[in-house]
């Protein structure tokens, strides 16, 4: 399934009838089983319905870092992002990709 950023934003955990999605490097993961983390009020709710690649690489929960852009990330931050991606792959199903 393909999602625009706008479509992905509809899966942000605020509508109980919809799953919760988080994208990493353009791949969309269904994180609904982690609702306590990614759902409304959860510690990582700022990632829900978005591509959180930059924020995950920087280990940041700042809204301005929640972005698909990898520009300017250090090698260490890229490695951190890759580690997060591996964790998500092991825990959550991939349901699609973000397209421009």
UniProtKB/Swiss-Prot annotation:
InterPro entries: Cyt_B5-like_heme/steroid-bd, Cyt_B5-like_heme/steroid_sf, MAPR/NEUFC/NENF-like. One of its GO terms (cellular component) is cytosol. It is found in: Nucleus. Gene3D superfamilies: Cytochrome b5-like heme/steroid binding domain (3.10.120.10). The modification N-acetylmethionine is found at residue 1. The keyword Acetylation applies. One of its GO terms (molecular function) is steroid binding. It comes from the Eukaryota. Keywords: Acetylation, Lipid-binding, Nucleus, Steroid-binding. Residues 1-82 form the Cytochrome b5 heme-binding domain. Induction: Down-regulated by auxin and cytokinin. Belongs to the cytochrome b5 family. MAPR subfamily. The cytochrome b5 heme-binding domain lacks the conserved iron-binding His residues at positions 37 and 61. This is Probable steroid-binding protein 3. It comes from Arabidopsis thaliana. The gene is MP3.
